[in-house]
């Protein structure tokens, strides 16, 4: 991705699925941010992304190349169903290019548009400092700390931080 690329964030399309699955699996394989351990296949990925309230892709407006994604869904049910949760993934080669900021900013808009009142992150890993700084810069509030709440790929445990943002 070059600096002149026009990046847009839009709802995913079926043709995005191979890239979405690949990017999601990169983050799962890294083992330092997502709690999932199982990789998505083409079939499980299609079902997974379709089951979300909203799935977005960050794409090059000219080429359609997908560089990142997010999923948005309820964090709970019933009386807490107005609180949503999201996960973000950026292709390894495109990290550090502020794609995450575009994804989170769009997610805040989509959360509101889908009737949610709060966006909550349950488990931001302590060592994920880039994400933590981004969330704080965008107005998220850290709720506390859950000691040794995340098992890293190498087997050691790290603290996790819940965050929220009113919509």
Spans of features found by a protein language model:
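Conserved acetyl-CoA-binding loop-helix of GNAT-fold acetyltransferases
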Residues: 96-111, 132-137
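Conserved beta-strand-loop-alpha-helix junction that forms the acyl-donor binding cleft
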Residues: 95, 121-131, 149-153
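Conserved GNAT acetyl-CoA-binding A-motif
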Residues: 111-124
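Hydrophobic pocket/interface hotspot
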Residues: 20, 24, 45
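Terminal substrate-recognition subdomain of acyl/acetyltransferases
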Residues: 1-5, 88, 146, 152-167
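Acetyl-CoA-dependent GNAT
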Residues: 33-93, 104-105, 110, 166-167
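Conserved active-site tyrosine of GNAT-family acetyltransferases
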Residues: 135, 140, 163
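A short beta-loop-alpha structural element at the N-terminal edge
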Residues: 7-20
